[in-house]
Amino acid sequence: MPLRNQNRAPLPSPNVKKEALSSIPFDKRRKETQGTGRRQVLSTVNRQDANSDVGSTEECGKVEFTKDEVLALLNERAKAGKFDTKGKIEQMTDIIKKLKVCVRWYQQVDETHVQDKENLSSSLQSAEKRYSDKELDAKTKEEELRATITEMKENIESLQEKLSKEKLSKLDAIENHRREKDCRVVAEKLQVSLREELDKVKEEKMAAKQKVTSLEDMYKRLQEYNTSLQQYNTKLQTDLEVAREAHTRAEKEKSSILENLTTLRGHSKSLQDQLASSRVSQDEAVKQKDSLLMEVNNLQSELQQVRDDRDRHVVQSQKLAGEILMYKESVGKSSHELDILIAKSGSLEETCSLQKERIKMLEQELAFAKEKLKMVDLSMSHTMTEFEEQKQCMHELQDRLADTERQLFEGELLRKKLHNTILELKGNIRVFCRVRPLLPDDGGRQEASVIAYPTSTESLGRGIDVVQSGNKHPFTFDKVFDHGASQEEVFFEISQLVQSALDGYKVCIFAYGQTGSGKTYTMMGRPETPEQKGLIPRSLEQIFKTSQSLSTQGWKYKMQVSMLEIYNESIRDLLSTSRTIAIESVRADSSTSGRQYTITHDVNGNTHVSDLTIVDVCSIGQISSLLQQAAQSRSVGKTHMNEQSSRSHFVFTLRISGVNESTEQQVQGVLNLIDLAGSERLSRSGATGDRLKETQAINKSLSALSDVIFALAKKEDHVPFRNSKLTYLLQPCLGGDSKTLMFVNISPDPSSTGESLCSLRFAARVNACEIGIPRRQTSAKLLDSRLSYG
């Protein structure tokens, strides 16, 4: 019995049976079992065994095994009789040979797989190295661009500070100039009156004595000499100005912008010093003139008194001389009286000589006063010359300031151009953030405690901080507008993007945010007030104005307009003539109107809406009336958060087809302007009934939009565009080759901080999405004239 057990063929292990059965599907196990009894197992190996007992390694490499053959080989058993030990041994030997061949084949296959794995690993390493090198180069270029932008912003800030300082100094200089001008006018008037009085004195002196005439002649000669000196001084000043201008030009050619700013500071300081000194000298000159005027008046009064005394003495002398003659002729006069008269006559003559000396002294004092007056005139001339120099210096500073402002403007344009180029190369969705002002119904003036704007160079005009529960949440976008930004400032930033539609690009601009955050005001504004027009009317005005200017270059444009709204996941035509304006019918389900609108996308990426009203437009007035019609038909309602809350998504589309007759070139652009309905919480809006249904539909579509953005950000293979009508309509804008910009509107109300944070986080994800590089639609043939949203 033991010998019988030893000669018996070994039974297969139960584990081997389980593994073999587990690798075969349950429904095919019976078929596999039946098939093994009707076919020759491992026919390839059997044919090889018939030719030779042991195959070489090279021959084994040519043999291939299938999975079924390997399983059959593992399940093969000896078929000899129960006591035929030799037959069993031969059969087991054959099975072992077959297994060796199979094992060798598996070894070769495994070696091949290892070699392929090594090759793939080396290829992967080289690809990763190339990718890391490219990524390093891209980061280096990005850092260089950021450094350039940072440097430009620093220069802009410093130049703006210098500009404000120069403006203040300019205003001070203008005020000082006005005061000096008034003082100069008063001084000139006093000088004219003084000269008139002096002329009168000269005339009286000419009548009184020839010596005064000679003094006046000498004074005239001195005046002529003074005039020649002034002319020579003016010539010297002109030469000095020419030399200074040449020196200034040389400095401008050699110095950089920083040196120019330093020079501006020095000139400003010296100008202030010169103005102060000129002001002091002007005051001294005025005081000297006043003192001289008083001295001249005193001299004139004394001179008049001396003249009166002299005339009186002359009259007395003549009278005495007549009396002497009369006394000489008179016989009854005594010689004693004659001596007395002679003595009186001598005393009168002595008094007259004293009066002459007094007149001479007064004349000398008058000449001294005239000399002082000439010195004052020279001082005034010198002051005027210095004032002209300072005025010239002010003009030079103004020219430099204008040149600096021009350089700042050119630098800002270059920065914007580089920024737009980077965004287009990246293919990202641009995001602008706008904060609306506080309203009387908001929770007090607490914006400063909720919203903050960073002042650093990198984040200036692009960053915004939201504070919630003491935690600051920073965000950075392509542009941030504070509550004081006007509609014109906002449109200026997107004007070039709107212009791209005329150049043949697809452009999409949409506003996102919670209800009551200012989306409709941003997009539509108040068209009846020019300063408060929104992006839609301003964009249309620019497009029509630019198209008219391009007509001189041979361009002719055809424009088509359509407007629709997505209300409760249904499309409504806002320009349909059969549409009822009544609010109740507007709120009715679109299924009851008998018209269904479907969205389709063609192979060119264009989106079409069936049965949608398309209107050809040729003027801004025509579009304004269409906008008014659409505004009356749009679904709006009152909630606790907003008096006129938009209850639907509004889509305005302008299709532009342009043809150049001279070059036969055609461009086709599309401008989509979208006002999304705002997200809202039921606890705050208090929506019930129809309002509740509207709120649920709005939140559902915005949630679908969020899912699409998340899928794009993660670069998933499947993007759920079909989950809502809104995302399916925006598919070419979010996943195509269009230029797309999103406005995220937030409220500064402290009670809306949570919603504002959600909106900003969503906007940050949108800004990180890559949708592809924009592609211009241009051709030499006329394209299909159907309206496209894409």
From Swiss-Prot:
Pfam family for this entry, one: Kinesin
Domain remark text: Composed of three structural domains; a small globular N-terminal, a central alpha-helical coiled coil and a large globular C-terminal which is responsible for the motor activity (it hydrolyzes ATP and binds microtubules).
Coiled coil: 117-316, 347-426
Job of this protein: Kinesin that supports microtubule movement in an ATP-dependent manner and that functions as a minus-end directed motor as well as a plus-end tracking protein. During mitosis, is involved in early spindle assembly. Participates in the capture of antiparallel interpolar microtubules and helps in generating force to coalign microtubules.
Protein's name in the database: Kinesin-like protein KIN-14D
Regions of compositional bias (Polar residues) in chain numbering: 34-55
CDD domains xref list: KISc_C_terminal
Misc remark: By measuring the velocity of microtubule translocation, the speed of ATK5 was determined to be 6.30 um/min at 20 degrees Celsius.
Annotated positions binding ATP: G513, Q514, T515, G516, S517, G518, K519, T520
Record domain Kinesin motor: where: 428-769
Family: Belongs to the TRAFAC class myosin-kinesin ATPase superfamily. Kinesin family. KIN-14 subfamily.
Tissue: Slightly expressed in anther lobes with pollen mother cells at anther stage 5. Strongly expressed at anther stage 6 in the tapetum and meiotic cells. Also detected in the gynoecium and the ovule.
Bias type Basic and acidic residues, positions: 16-33, 127-139
One biological process term in Gene Ontology: microtubule-based movement
Localization per Swiss-Prot or TrEMBL: Cytoplasm, Cytoskeleton; Cytoplasm, Cytoskeleton, Phragmoplast
PROSITE patterns: KINESIN_MOTOR_1, KINESIN_MOTOR_2
PANTHER family membership: KINESIN-LIKE PROTEIN KLP-3, PROTEIN CLARET SEGREGATIONAL
Primary site of residence: cytoplasm
Reported consequences of knocking out the gene: No visible phenotype under normal growth conditions, but dividing cells of mutant plants exhibit abnormally broadened mitotic spindles in metaphase and anaphase. However, this does not affect chromosome alignment and segregation. Kin14c and kin14d double mutant is gametophytically lethal.
A GO MF term: microtubule binding
One annotated Gene Ontology cellular component of this protein: nucleus
Region of interest (Disordered), ranges: 1-56, 116-139
Organism per entry: Arabidopsis thaliana (Mouse-ear cress)
